[in-house]
Regions:
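Catalytic cores of nucleic-acid endonucleases
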Residues: 1, 87-88, 93-145
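Sequence-level detector for tyrosine residue identity
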Residues: 6, 14-16, 59, 82, ...
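Intrinsically disordered, low-complexity terminal regions enriched in charged/polar residues
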Residues: 138-160
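Catalytic phosphate/metal-binding cores of nucleic-acid and nucleotide-processing enzymes, i.e., regions
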Residues: 44-65, 71-75, 99-119, 127
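Catalytic centers of nucleases
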Residues: 66-94, 98
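Acidic-basic catalytic patches of nuclease active cores, encompassing PD-(D/E)XK
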Residues: 2-71
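Generic detector of bulky aromatic hydrophobic side chains
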Residues: 32-36, 80, 90, 117
């Protein structure tokens, strides 16, 4: 008998153990573009984790809805499942670092809608842009681990 792996996010490990994740600590990068390594740049998983938190804290918390599940895997769909007025919703979260704005292709939209239809769920996509609070890093589109950020929820749209 094989068991499915239980996945736990870095953030959850950080919150529930004494092992503190250095990538989740606030860092003082100073002003301007500092010396940094490739490992200091946020990876796709960290950007999505940030985006899911933004949607949960700044969008869904203001809706009268019930959170059913969240999935912070970059290849996964949906990232967030919630219920509102007895209707099931499945949401995909896209995050980009300015000046790039995240987009969703027609093929992706068709796949998400098809999947949602199997569950009689509404399909929702959320587009979020983040940028460093430092002007030079913002202009460079640089997302460093532990930096301060500004965010914008570009859109949350229902596809079906």
């Amino acid at each position: 008998m094989t068991k499915e792996p239980y996945l736990i996010s870095r953030k959850a490990i950080h919150q529930h153990t004494n092992r503190k994740d250095s990538r989740l600590q606030i860092r003082d990068w100073g002003v301007g573009i500092p010396d940094f390594n490739k490992e200091d740049i946020m990876v796709e998983e960290e950007l999505l984790d940030f985006g899911v938190d933004i949607i949960l804290d700044h969008y869904l918390s203001k809706q009268e809805c019930k959170l059913i599940e969240e999935n912070r895997g970059v290849a996964g769909f949906p990232n967030i499942v919630y219920q509102k007025n007895n209707q099931l919703y499945m949401m995909k979260v896209f995050v980009g670092v300015l000046p790039n704005r995240p987009t969703c292709t027609k093929e992706q939209k068709d796949f998400y809608i098809s999947h949602c239809n199997k569950f009689n769920a509404k399909c929702v996509i959320a587009s979020i842009s983040i940028c460093s609070s430092d002007e030079e890093r913002k202009k460079a589109g640089l997302a460093l681990v532990g930096d301060g950020y500004n965010m914008c929820i570009n859109e949350v749209i229902e596809l079906n």
